């Protein structure tokens, strides 16, 4: 919202007479903005073409002014568990995940986090384990667009090992680093993938694919997610542990670490498409509050309409379609 002073969207792209369209606006301006309805005849901005032609439609919606207010939004896709996972450690805690990083960043990129524990890629491109504010990193940077398995094991006495293995080179050995980090015996909390969540706000988004996250406590698997399941939805059912909810529509059924180009249809070999691709700029719904509504009058002709908002030199248009009334006779 740094560069756009006046911006809006509608909750639906089409409506029939009698139905309601809600409009959600963000304005950084101090003055009120004005909303007016137009019927679009031509939306061609080419000066050599017909041009933009609009008809006044104020008899269906009276031109009205509304107070300006800024509404924030947070792009970036991630997953978060529907419920907290109970983690009570007596001996050790292990977490493993397969990743395919696609973009380097000056910011940390969170891969998986729970409670005060996080695996992430730091600004130098190193896979890192963090507990509270202390961290240990692998000394060799990750290669972009390559599959890696990352595994972290922490014992109750604070001994930590973090390892990574690049999967495309079978003869290349696993790289490991060790250190000392103290973790809480009770590490219960919500699990997040591809972002870290603080006070309900996500940040440090991961760019790339994630596959097969797994949490083990005292050699017993308590969290295990098959990301190839239920791919038509925004819910990931668990094998063990709480369900994951996907935010801002990451891409599902994408090629995973087992994909060998033998099958191009993810439905035929779902295990070859067992990854989810997350992006820091994914967006689905800004979840803004409604500023005003239009209940489409019964006599409104079908066609393309635009709700235009304006404040001084700033303006925006929100197009939508008015469809004919169902079961009403139409001209032949």
Regions flagged by a language model, labelled:
Residues 129-149:
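Short, aromatic/His-centered strand-loop micro-motif at the edge of beta-sheets
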Residues 93-105, 150-152, 193, 210-215, ...:
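Short hydrophobic/aromatic patches on beta-strands that form ligand-binding or substrate-lining surfaces
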Residues 95-97, 145-164:
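Short tryptophan-centered beta-strand motifs in secreted/extracellular beta-sheet-rich domains
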Residues 33, 284-329:
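Extended acidic/polar, glycine-enriched regions
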Residues 1, 7, 186-189, 223, ...:
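Low-complexity, Pro/Ser/Thr- and charge-rich linker/hinge segments at domain boundaries
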Residues 34-35, 40-73, 177-187, 203, ...:
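Extracytoplasmic low-complexity segments
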Residues 124-128, 171-210:
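Flexible glycan-contacting loops in extracellular carbohydrate-active proteins
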Residues 76-130, 217-222:
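Extracellular glycan-recognition modules
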């Amino acid at each position: 919202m740094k560069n756009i002073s006046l911006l809006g969207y509608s909750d639906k792209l089409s409506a029939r007479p009698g139905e309601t369209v809600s409009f959600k606006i963000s304005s950084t301006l101090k003055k009120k903005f004005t909303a007016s309805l137009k019927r679009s005849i031509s939306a061609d901005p080419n000066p050599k073409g017909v041009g933009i032609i609009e008809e006044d439609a104020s008899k269906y919606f009276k031109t009205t002014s509304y107070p300006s207010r800024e509404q924030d939004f947070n792009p970036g896709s991630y997953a978060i568990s529907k419920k907290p996972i109970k983690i009570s450690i007596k001996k050790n805690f292990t977490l493993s995940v397969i990743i395919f990083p696609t973009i380097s960043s000056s910011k940390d990129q969170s891969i998986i986090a729970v409670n005060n524990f996080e695996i992430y890629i730091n600004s130098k491109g190193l896979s890192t384990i963090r507990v509270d504010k202390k961290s240990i990193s692998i000394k060799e940077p990750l290669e972009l667009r390559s599959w890696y398995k990352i595994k972290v094991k922490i014992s109750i006495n604070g001994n930590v090992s973090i390892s990574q293995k690049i999967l495309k080179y079978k003869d290349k050995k696993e790289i490991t680093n060790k250190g000392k980090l103290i973790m809480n015996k009770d590490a219960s909390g919500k699990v997040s993938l591809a972002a870290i969540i603080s006070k309900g706000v996500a940040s440090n988004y991961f760019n790339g694919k994630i596959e097969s996250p797994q949490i083990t406590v005292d050699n017993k698997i308590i969290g295990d997610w098959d990301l190839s399941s239920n791919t038509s939805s925004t819910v990931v059912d668990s094998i063990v542990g709480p369900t994951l909810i996907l935010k801002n529509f990451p891409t599902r059924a994408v090629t995973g670490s087992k994909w060998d180009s033998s099958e191009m249809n993810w439905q035929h070999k779902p295990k070859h498409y067992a990854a989810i691709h997350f992006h820091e700029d994914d967006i689905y719904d800004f979840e803004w509050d409604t500023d005003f509504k239009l209940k489409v009058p019964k006599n409104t002709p079908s066609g393309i309409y635009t709700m235009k908002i304006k404040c001084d030199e700033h303006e925006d248009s929100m197009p939508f379609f008015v469809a004919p009334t169902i079961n009403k006779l139409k001209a032949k």
